[in-house]
């Protein structure tokens, strides 16, 4: 899905470590001549004597030096935003996250190339030197790491080690760039305090991505953490610095507590797709409302680099346009939102000229199968907690959840496609994707959406769908009641847009409901969005359910 120029990006945040970094860069040159890699150094406003402008010119491998100004840095000492600047520039398939003072011993890139998978986070063992003399002696004779006398004098020796101290921190660690993009890097809330950013990213790697975290044995290679003076904290008094630590500790502890109380068998990733058209305030409410009821989730918004403007289908769905204010840039202000611009030429979907609605229907299946998590349309206002709902409503170990409701007049189920929840690489989505070409029809608005799901999963059509179903392990599939996000159906729009008797409390207190799907493609919805006056609504009484839900956020 993402295209990369290098096999590896080695990303490091840097502040006043010039002698140590020189050793690190020299070792790269000595060890990794055969590898396709780049080094990204983000200089967090170092002093003049530690400037790297001339140093980086002395290496024949690509070094991207990014410098942070004094104004941009301010009084911040936490490096989370520093590393994130580097991550956004990383063009390697694998990202190595490390401190500049950590020098490699052994062929670390070779081990990663042969062993790191899409479900892995590897942290290399890190041997610490407690003085400049210990550093000099060890760099001259690396075998001293196994010398009991040297270790007794150097104590504490291992900052990271699979048995002695398995903290898994990123003294030198690696993961696939695809996975790092889904996290968005470090949580920048931690930039306001001190410490605990490394704890949070490990929590996110586990809870949000579901990766296997491990610290590798020194036998496969390790890093030496070269001694350096700790001068970053000197701008604060001891009391001030302690307060910054406590601030981040409270933030981290809050995340841990939330995830312990809201455990979920699916990755905590929310995926959304937007086609580049005008983005209404109601669309924005999908993210604002989700964040009101959820903590510690990562939200990924995917947009096409070159959206197709034509609408190939011959029916009347989604023909009306929203022409009001574009609120899309508001998403950039939300720290847990990552926006990705996708080139469909890099995806295994041959119909590159397909209409955006149809491409988005393919894309939701592809992304959900690749990463797992919750797929949501951009026309759901969340009114409660998704994790809480699924804890009480899902029975058994399910890997894919589809939501449906009974159409009583026709005596069959309707399967809408506004919401899916899945684990990555489940057999349900894999089976559908293997057969996707059977269902593509540019004349049909829902050819890869509701129409396809109705064909596959309604029992009346079992014999026709059997070749597709046989590709699946149906025990992985759970069918949930779509009432949870569709308390009003497509033919009940008046209950949302016109009926003043329908109140928000009815959907906020219902244990079987966690959201309201407001049907962005409907004419009533477009009319509402085009005529919404936030200032007027803020100072007046709501006239309908959607008014009441919107007013909670203005």
Describe each PLM feature range.
Residues 8-20, 24, 31-32, 42, ...:
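A conserved hydrophobic helix/loop-capping motif in glycosyltransferases and polysaccharide synthases
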Residues 26-36, 289-296:
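Short, acidic, metal-binding catalytic loop of nucleotide-sugar glycosyltransferases
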Residues 43-54, 102-103, 305-309:
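A conserved acidic beta->alpha catalytic loop
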Residues 71-90, 358-364:
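Glycine-rich, basic loop-to-helix element that forms the pyrophosphate-binding segment
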Residues 87-88, 105-189, 390-450:
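Conserved catalytic core of nucleotide-sugar-dependent glycosyltransferases
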Residues 95, 373-375:
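Short aromatic/hydrophobic "clamp" motif used to bind/position activated sugar donors
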Residues 192-200, 360:
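Acidic donor-binding loop at a coil-to-helix junction in glycosyltransferase catalytic cores
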Residues 253, 260-360, 378-554:
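Glycosyltransferase-associated regions of secretory-pathway enzymes
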């Amino acid at each position: 899905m993402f295209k990369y120029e290098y096999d590896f990006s080695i990303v490091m945040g840097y502040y006043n470590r010039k002698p140590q970094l020189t050793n690190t860069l020299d070792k790269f040159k000595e060890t990794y001549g055969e590898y396709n890699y780049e080094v990204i150094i983000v200089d967090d406003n170092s002093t003049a004597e530690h400037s790297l402008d001339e140093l980086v010119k002395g290496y024949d491998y690509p070094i991207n030096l990014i410098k942070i100004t004094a104004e941009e840095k301010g009084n911040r000492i936490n490096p989370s935003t520093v590393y994130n600047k580097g991550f956004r520039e990383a063009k390697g398939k694998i990202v190595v996250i490390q401190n500049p003072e950590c020098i490699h011993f052994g062929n670390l890139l070779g081990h990663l190339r042969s062993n790191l998978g899409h479900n892995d986070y590897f942290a290399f063992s890190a041997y610490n030197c407690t003085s400049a003399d210990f550093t000099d002696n060890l760099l001259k004779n690396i075998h001293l790491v196994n010398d009991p006398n040297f270790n007794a004098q150097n104590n504490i020796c291992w900052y990271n080690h699979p048995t002695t101290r398995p903290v898994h921190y990123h003294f030198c660690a690696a993961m696939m760039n695809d996975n790092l993009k889904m996290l968005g890097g470090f949580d920048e809330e931690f930039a306001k305090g001190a410490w605990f950013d490394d704890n949070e990213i490990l929590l996110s790697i586990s809870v949000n991505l579901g990766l296997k975290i491990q610290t590798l044995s020194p036998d496969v290679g390790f890093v030496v953490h070269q001694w350096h003076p700790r001068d970053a904290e000197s701008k604060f008094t001891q009391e001030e610095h302690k307060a910054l630590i406590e601030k981040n500790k409270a933030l981290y502890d809050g995340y841990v507590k939330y995830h312990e109380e809201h455990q979920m068998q699916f990755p905590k990733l929310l995926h959304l797709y937007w086609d580049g058209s005008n983005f209404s305030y109601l669309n924005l409410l999908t993210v604002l409302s989700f964040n009101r009821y959820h903590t510690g989730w990562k939200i990924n918004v995917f947009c096409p680099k070159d959206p197709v403007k034509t609408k190939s289908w011959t029916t009347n769905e989604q023909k009306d346009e929203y022409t009001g204010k574009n609120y899309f840039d508001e998403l950039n202000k939300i720290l847990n939102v990552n926006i990705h611009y996708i080139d469909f030429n890099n995806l295994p979907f041959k119909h590159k000229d397909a209409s955006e609605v149809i491409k988005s229907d393919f894309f939701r299946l592809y992304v959900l199968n690749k990463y797992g998590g919750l797929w949501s349309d951009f026309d759901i206002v969340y009114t409660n907690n998704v994790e809480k709902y699924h804890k009480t409503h899902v029975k058994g170990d399910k890997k894919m959840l589809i939501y449906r409701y009974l159409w009583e007049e026709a005596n069959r189920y309707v399967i809408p496609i506004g919401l899916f929840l899945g684990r990555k690489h489940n057999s349900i989505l894999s089976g559908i994707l293997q057969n996707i070409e059977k269902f593509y029809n540019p004349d049909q608005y829902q050819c890869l959406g509701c129409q396809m799901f109705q064909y596959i999963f309604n029992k009346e059509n079992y014999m026709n769908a059997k070749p597709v179903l046989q590709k699946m392990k149906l025990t992985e599939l759970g069918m949930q009641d779509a009432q949870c996000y569709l308390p009003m159906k497509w033919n009940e729009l008046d209950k949302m847009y016109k009926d003043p008797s329908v109140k928000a409390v009815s959907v906020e207190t219902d244990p079987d409901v966690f959201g309201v799907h407001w049907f962005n493609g409907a004419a009533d919805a477009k009319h509402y969005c085009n005529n919404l006056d936030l200032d007027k609504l803020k100072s007046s009484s709501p006239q309908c359910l959607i008014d009441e839900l919107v007013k909670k956020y203005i």
